[in-house]
C-alpha cells in the first residue's frame, strides 16, 4: 500500500500562515531554498511498510514552498519576479528501471531507423528498416578453460529510454552488455564493459537472417568475412541491400556452413582476450538499402562516434520529456509509468526509407519469420495514439503520423488499416487483403485530425486536408444502411476482426465512431471558414447521435448492445467496446452510468484491466483474442469514459492497472493483450504495443486530470477527479497556441489552491478550472489573487464540480477555493502475482442521501477477503455499517470484510457510511 506524502514544510492555505512579515520576499525564499538544496537537509518520512517511491520529493517540496511564498507576495501586493515556472528546464528525470532478470521477458531497444528485439537473457535479433539482418544473437564467455553461455549468468536488467543493460556475473568476472540503437542511424551497437580477475574472452554468435519484412523477400543472400572491417558482410546478388556485423577487435571468425553430412546456421567471432582488470569491447551492426559502400560508411561512423551518439540519444529523450506535458504526481509508480509511456509512444515513430515516417503499432521478436510483432504502420493504432500525443503536446509526431496514413487513402476515401514496411516491394494495396481491412480507421481519421487541429491550433492542416477529409466522409456515408447506420458487414470489420462475436451488421463501437466523426468534421468545417457546411454537419450529428443511442440501447437491462445482426436485432453481449462512444460523450448520463457500473464488476474488470466481454458469457474464453482477453487499449477506453461520466473509482482502478503494467513485463512498456483468466500476457502478445502506452497517457491527462486544450480559441480546461489521498500535483509545458502554462494544485483541509501562469508566450488565454469535490462538501468562497471571483457549482449524481473561469496573460494567478466538509475515500489497487486470478475490490456504485448524511457503497470482492480504503476527513464519520474504521500513521482506514461464500466466489456487499453534518468539535 502506497503511503501519502506529507511535507515537513507545511503548505498553508492562508498567507498569514506563511509570513512572519511582508519583508519575506520571493528572492529571500529562493535563496533559502537554494541553501537548503545544497545542504541536502530534507528527508522523507513514510509510514511503516511503505515503498520508497518518492525519489523526487525534495523537488516538489521546493516547488511547493516557492509557490506558497509566491502566493503570499501576490496577496500582500509584493511584486512577483520574472522567470517563474521554469521547473521543466531544471528537471532531468531519472527514468532508469532495474530488476532481477526474467529471461522470458521481452527487451526492445529502438531507434527511428533500426531496432534490436530480444529478451532479458540477451538473445537478440537486429533490424535496419525494412531489413532483418540477424537473429539469435548471443554471447559466450571463455574463462578458465570453460565456455559459459551468457544467458546462464544474466542477473540484472537495467533499462533507460536510450539503451538497456544486462549484467552478467560469474565467480571471477562481470560483463555489462549495453544494447544501444542511435535515434537516426541505420544500425546498432552492443557495448561490453568487462571486469575480470582471470583471463576472459567473449565470443559473439548469431544466425544470419538477411531478409525484408513480410511479405517481401530478397531471394538469394550470402555471408562473407570482411577482414579489413573485422566484420561479417551480408549481401545479395543485386548488391543493393547490405550489412556489416563485427567489432574493431573481432577475430577468429566462424561462418555458417552446410554440407552433405552436417550443417550449422551459427556464425561467430571472438573479441580478443582481456587478461585482467577492466576493458571495453564493442560490437557494431550496420545496414544499408544503398549498397555496400553506404553500409561500410555507417559501420565506421558507429564505431568511431558511438560515445557521442549515445550522448545525443540521451539528450533526445531528455529534451522530448522536458518539452512535452510534464507531470509531478504524489504516486511515483504512476509518475514513472506516465513518463515511460511517453517514451514508448515516441519509440513507435519509425522512418522507412521507401515509405516515409509514421507510427508503427508495436514490437515483438519475429523468430524465424519476418513479422516483428506489429512493427509496421496501422491506421487505427496511429489515430488512437495520436489522441495521447496531442494530449501531451507532441504535435509534430501526431501530425507526422496523420500525414503518413493519409498518403495511402484509397481513391474512394477509405483510410488504410495497415501498411507493411515491405509494401513498396510488392503489390500491397491491390494484391493483399490487409491494407483496407477495417472500416473503423476511416471515422477515426476524421476524429484524430480534428483533435490534432483543436489541441495544436494548426488550422492550416485542416485546410490542407479538407479534400481528404471530405473523401473519408463520403466513404463513411457510402457504408450507411437504410436507417443511416454505418455498416461493417461488406465494408470492413469494426473492432472485432474474428471469432464467435461475428458476424454482425454494425457494432455500437463503429456506429459511435461514425457519429463522432460528424461532430469532428463539423468543427473542422468551422475552423476552415465553412460555416454553412459546419451547421449542416452539426445537425446531422445530433440526428446521428440520437439514432445510434436508440438503436443499441436495451432499456430493461440498462446497457448497450454490442452490435446489431443482419436483421437489425440487438445482440445483448455487454462489452467494454461501449466505452468508446462514451469516451466522446455520446450517450446520456442516464444511459452511460448504469452500463459503466455493470462493466465495473468482476466479470468484466480484472485486476489488470478490462475483458472484451463478461467471463460469464458462453462465448468467453480467457485466451480469446477478440472474445475474452484483456487489452490495455480497452482498459484505457474504459478509464477515460468512466472519468467523463464521473465514475472515479473504476476509472482510477483501470488507469492504475495500465500504469502498473508499464512497470512490469517488458520494463517501461505496456503489452498488447493479456489473458482474461489470469495475470499473464497472451503467448502471442506484442509486449511493446504503442497504443497500449497511449492508454496510460490519455487516462491520466484526458481522464483523471481532465486536461483539455483548445488552441484555436486559446483556452484550457482542467477538471481533475483525484484520488482522495492525493493532495497535490503539478503540470508543466501545457501548450496553448504560442503560450505554455504551468499548473500547481494543492489540497488542504481548508480547500484547494491552484497556481497558474504563462511560462512562455504573452497571448491572453482562458483557464476553466473544474475540480471535482464530494456531494458532502460546501463551497464557502472563491478568490483569485485575493479578490472574490464568481463561480458555479454543477451537481451530479456522484459528485460536484466547482467551475471558475478566468483570463491568464502576464503575471501569476493564485486561485483559492474555501471548502467545508470535503469527504472522500481511496484505494490503491495492485497487480496480482504473475499467473494469479483477480482478487481486488470493486466499488460498483455510490449513492448519497438527499441530506448528504449517508453514503452507500455497492461493492464486490473475493469471498472472505478484507479490503482497506483510506479516508479523507474521517472526523465526519458517525458510524459505518458493513465495515469498520481503523488507524494507521497519518490516516484513518475503512476496512471492508467480504462475507465468506461457498456458492459465490466474488459476492456483492453494501457499506453504509453515516456522516455528521460537520466535523464534531474535539
Spans of features found by a protein language model:
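Boundary at the C-terminal end of the N-terminal hydrophobic targeting segment
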Residues: 25-29, 85
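Acidic/polar, glycine-enriched structural segments that form the non-catalytic walls/loops
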Residues: 84-98, 158, 173-176, 180-373, ...
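Bacterial N-terminal signal peptides
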Residues: 16, 67-79
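Structural helix-adjacent loops and short alpha-helical linkers that scaffold large soluble proteins
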Residues: 327-336, 352-353, 390-402, 452-470, ...
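C-terminal capping/lid segments that line or modulate ligand- or cofactor-binding pockets
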Residues: 87-135, 374-378, 385, 430-455, ...
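Extended glycan-interaction surfaces of carbohydrate-active proteins
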Residues: 289-291, 328-376, 400-437, 442, ...
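Non-catalytic C-terminal accessory modules of carbohydrate-active enzymes
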Residues: 130-136, 140-185, 602-604, 637, ...
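Aromatic-rich carbohydrate-recognition surfaces in CAZymes
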Residues: 196, 275, 279, 306, ...
Amino acid at each position: 500500500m502506497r503511503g501519502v506524502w506529507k511535507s515537513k514544510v507545511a503548505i498553508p492555505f492562508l498567507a498569514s500562515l506563511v509570513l512572519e512579515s511582508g519583508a519575506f520576499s520571493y528572492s529571500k525564499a529562493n535563496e533559502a531554498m537554494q541553501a537548503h538544496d545544497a545542504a541536502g537537509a530534507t528527508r522523507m518520512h513514510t509510514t511503516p511498510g511503505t515503498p520508497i517511491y518518492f525519489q523526487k520529493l525534495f523537488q516538489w517540496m521546493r516547488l511547493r514552498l516557492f509557490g506558497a511564498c509566491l502566493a503570499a507576495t501576490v496577496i500582500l501586493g509584493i511584486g512577483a519576479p520574472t522567470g517563474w515556472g521554469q521547473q521543466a528546464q531544471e528537471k532531468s528525470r531519472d527514468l532508469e528501471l532495474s530488476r532481477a532478470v526474467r529471461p522470458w521477458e521481452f527487451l526492445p531497444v529502438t531507434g527511428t531507423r533500426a531496432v534490436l528485439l530480444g529478451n532479458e537473457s540477451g538473445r537478440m535479433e537486429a533490424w535496419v528498416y525494412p531489413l532483418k539482418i540477424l537473429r539469435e544473437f548471443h554471447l559466450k564467455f571463455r574463462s578458465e578453460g570453460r565456455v559459459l553461455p551468457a544467458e546462464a549468468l544474466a542477473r540484472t536488467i537495467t533499462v533507460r529510454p536510450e539503451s538497456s543493460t544486462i549484467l552478467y556475473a560469474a565467480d571471477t568476472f562481470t560483463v555489462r552488455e549495453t544494447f544501444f540503437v542511435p535515434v537516426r542511424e541505420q544500425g546498432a551497437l552492443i557495448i561490453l564493459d568487462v571486469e575480470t580477475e582471470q583471463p576472459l574472452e567473449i565470443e559473439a554468435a548469431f544466425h544470419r537472417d538477411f531478409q525484408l519484412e513480410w511479405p517481401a523477400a530478397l531471394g538469394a543472400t550470402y555471408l562473407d568475412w570482411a577482414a579489413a572491417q573485422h566484420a561479417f558482410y551480408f549481401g545479395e546478388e543485386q548488391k543493393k541491400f547490405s550489412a556489416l556485423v563485427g567489432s574493431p577487435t573481432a577475430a577468429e571468425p566462424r561462418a555458417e556452413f552446410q554440407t552433405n553430412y552436417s550443417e550449422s546456421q551459427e556464425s561467430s567471432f571472438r573479441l580478443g582476450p582481456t587478461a585482467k582488470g577492466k576493458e571495453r569491447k564493442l560490437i557494431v551492426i550496420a545496414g544499408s538499402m544503398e549498397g555496400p559502400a553506404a553500409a561500410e560508411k555507417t559501420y565506421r561512423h558507429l564505431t568511431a562516434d558511438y560515445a557521442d551518439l549515445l550522448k545525443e540519444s540521451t539528450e533526445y529523450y531528455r529534451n522530448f520529456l522536458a518539452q512535452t506535458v510534464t507531470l509531478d504526481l504524489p504516486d511515483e509508480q504512476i509518475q514513472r509509468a506516465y513518463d515511460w509511456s511517453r517514451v514508448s509512444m515516441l519509440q513507435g515513430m519509425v522512418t522507412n526509407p521507401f515509405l516515409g515516417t509514421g507510427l508503427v503499432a508495436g514490437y515483438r521478436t519475429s523468430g524465424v519469420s519476418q513479422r516483428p510483432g506489429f512493427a509496421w504502420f496501422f491506421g487505427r493504432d496511429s489515430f488512437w495514439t495520436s489522441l495521447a500525443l496531442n494530449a501531451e503536446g507532441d504535435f509534430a509526431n501526431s501530425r507526422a503520423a496523420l500525414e503518413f496514413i493519409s498518403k495511402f487513402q484509397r481513391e474512394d476515401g477509405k483510410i488504410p488499416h495497415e501498411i507493411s514496411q515491405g509494401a513498396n516491394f510488392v503489390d500491397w494495396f491491390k494484391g493483399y487483403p490487409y491494407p483496407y481491412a477495417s472500416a473503423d480507421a476511416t471515422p477515426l481519421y476524421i476524429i484524430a485530425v480534428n483533435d490534432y487541429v483543436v489541441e495544436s491550433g494548426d488550422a492550416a492542416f485542416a485546410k490542407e486536408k479538407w479534400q481528404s477529409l471530405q473523401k473519408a466522409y463520403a466513404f463513411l456515408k457510402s457504408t450507411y444502411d437504410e436507417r443511416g447506420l454505418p455498416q461493417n458487414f461488406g465494408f470492413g470489420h469494426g473492432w472485432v476482426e474474428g471469432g464467435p462475436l461475428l458476424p454482425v451488421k454494425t457494432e455500437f463501437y463503429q456506429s459511435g465512431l461514425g457519429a463522432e466523426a460528424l461532430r469532428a468534421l463539423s468543427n473542422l468545417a468551422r475552423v476552415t471558414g465553412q460555416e454553412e457546411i459546419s451547421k449542416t454537419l452539426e445537425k446531422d450529428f445530433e440526428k446521428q447521435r440520437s439514432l445510434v443511442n436508440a438503436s443499441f440501447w436495451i432499456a430493461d437491462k440498462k446497457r448497450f448492445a454490442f452490435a446489431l445482426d443482419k436483421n437489425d436485432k440487438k445482440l445483448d453481449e455487454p462489452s467494454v467496446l461501449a466505452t468508446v462512444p462514451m469516451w466522446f460523450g455520446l450517450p446520456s448520463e442516464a444511459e452511460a452510468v448504469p452500463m459503466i457500473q455493470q462493466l465495473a464488476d468482476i466479470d468484466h474488470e480484472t485486476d489488470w484491466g478490462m475483458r472484451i466481454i463478461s467471463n460469464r458469457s458462453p462465448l468467453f474464453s480467457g485466451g480469446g483474442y477478440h472474445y475474452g482477453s484483456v487489452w490495455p487499449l480497452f482498459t484505457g477506453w474504459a478509464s477515460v469514459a468512466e472519468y467523463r461520466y464521473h465514475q472515479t473509482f473504476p476509472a482510477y482502478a483501470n488507469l492504475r492497472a495500465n500504469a502498473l503494467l508499464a512497470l512490469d513485463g517488458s520494463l517501461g512498456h505496456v503489452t498488447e493483450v493479456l489473458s482474461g483468466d489470469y495475470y499473464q500476457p497472451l503467448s502471442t502478445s506484442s509486449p511493446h504495443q504503442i497504443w497500449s502506452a497511449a492508454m496510460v497517457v490519455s487516462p491520466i491527462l484526458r481522464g483523471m486530470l481532465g486536461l483539455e486544450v483548445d488552441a484555436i480559441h486559446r483556452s484550457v480546461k482542467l477538471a481533475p477527479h483525484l484520488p482522495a489521498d492525493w493532495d497535490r500535483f503539478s503540470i508543466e509545458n501545457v501548450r496553448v497556441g504560442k503560450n505554455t502554462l504551468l499548473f500547481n494544485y494543492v489540497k488542504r483541509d481548508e480547500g484547494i489552491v491552484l497556481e497558474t501562469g504563462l511560462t512562455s508566450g504573452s497571448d491572453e488565454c482562458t483557464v476553466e478550472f473544474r475540480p471535482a469535490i464530494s456531494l458532502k462538501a460546501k463551497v464557502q468562497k472563491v478568490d483569485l489573487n485575493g479578490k472574490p471571483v464568481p463561480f458555479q457549482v454543477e451537481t451530479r449524481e456522484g459528485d460536484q464540480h466547482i467551475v471558475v473561469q478566468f483570463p491568464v496573460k502576464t503575471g501569476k494567478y493564485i486561485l483559492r477555493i474555501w471548502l467545508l466538509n470535503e469527504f472522500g475515500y481511496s484505494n490503491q489497487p495492485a497487480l496480482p502475482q504473475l499467473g494469479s486470478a483477480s482478487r481486488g475490490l470493486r466499488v460498483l456504485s455510490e449513492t448519497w442521501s438527499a441530506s448528504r448524511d449517508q453514503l452507500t457503497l455497492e461493492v464486490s470482492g473475493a469471498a472472505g477477503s478484507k479490503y482497506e480504503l483510506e479516508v479523507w476527513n474521517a472526523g465526519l464519520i458517525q458510524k459505518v455499517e458493513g465495515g469498520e474504521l481503523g488507524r494507521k500513521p497519518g490516516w484513518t482506514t475503512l476496512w471492508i470484510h467480504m462475507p465468506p461464500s461457498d456458492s459465490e466466489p466474488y459476492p456483492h456487499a453494501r457499506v453504509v457510511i453515516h456522516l455528521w453534518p460537520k466535523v464534531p468539535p474535539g
